[in-house]
């Protein structure tokens, strides 16, 4: 009796070691072998695979410049390869937040780009926020279609870490620009955004880029119940976003009679990479944007890492200063103390394991140090 030849699996047919996950799946359903072979033949290697076979299951992130907002987003900031929307009223800090994200990407050796559809980009303000102007790409497109085409080309290059579009409301379709003022152009911008999202989503997912859309708010007419607020550009952006951040100004910061900043509340109204509806509050100064050290003091006090007695701030046996401003300056001048507080705050929030050294390990380290000193 002639034995039937064994059907080769997609990986085995090429002499490649079979992934354990794929092996388990094929043992459960042998009939999948032919289907998987056909899929890989038609669409190439890696067109379908077990999730565990992926080399990377964690999502890389870029910090927002605010530790409380990073924690609200899931611990590390905004995710790469995803679409993010930052929206809110005028002068709430949307562009400042987006530029801080760009500055943080540059600090880690990345490249940031801004597509300035509003034609209102201020280089001097960006520099104060820590943005390196020499490595910042800036484009001021003449139409919405041009802006989205530039964005698509930057994403497909896989060389840009953050692409900021400022703003969705200013992405004017070409037909509207070529028409007369007063002409009706119903749904043109929503159609532009819908088509752009369909084209961009796949390319963004395969890249290292985080695309940040800044958006304004409008009010719907005749709404009796619920919030009348909405954002321009239709519903497509809301659906395709992985994170949506609602930024609001909730108070003023004063030095005597002079207003030196504002208190900002950011609510994560949508999050596909962490639990949504978390809220972060932080200070945004008029001199240099988000106060990282001020935010760290608030979080440290809240998580009992930093003790506050009256107006004095104390970390362990170290007095940080009397008053928040002096304590903030102390942390700026002592980055090692600031980093230590940051790690303990993250550990208290459950985002990293607390740094602990066993007694045996510390004794070994001392002995090693003595041996080196005596040699």
UniProtKB/Swiss-Prot annotation:
Subcellular location field: Cytoplasm
Keyword DNA damage attached: yes
Residues that coordinate or bind ATP: 88-95
Alphabetical UniProt keywords: ATP-binding, Cytoplasm, DNA damage, DNA recombination, DNA repair, DNA-binding, Nucleotide-binding, SOS response
Xref: PROSITE patterns: RECA_2, RECA_3
GO cellular component entries: cytoplasm
Protein task: Can catalyze the hydrolysis of ATP in the presence of single-stranded DNA, the ATP-dependent uptake of single-stranded DNA by duplex DNA, and the ATP-dependent hybridization of homologous single-stranded DNAs. It interacts with LexA causing its activation and leading to its autocatalytic cleavage.
Listed HAMAP family: RecA
Family that this chain belongs to: Belongs to the RecA family.
Name by which UniProt lists this protein: Protein RecA
UniProt source species: Rhodopirellula baltica (strain DSM 10527 / NCIMB 13988 / SH1)
Gene: recA
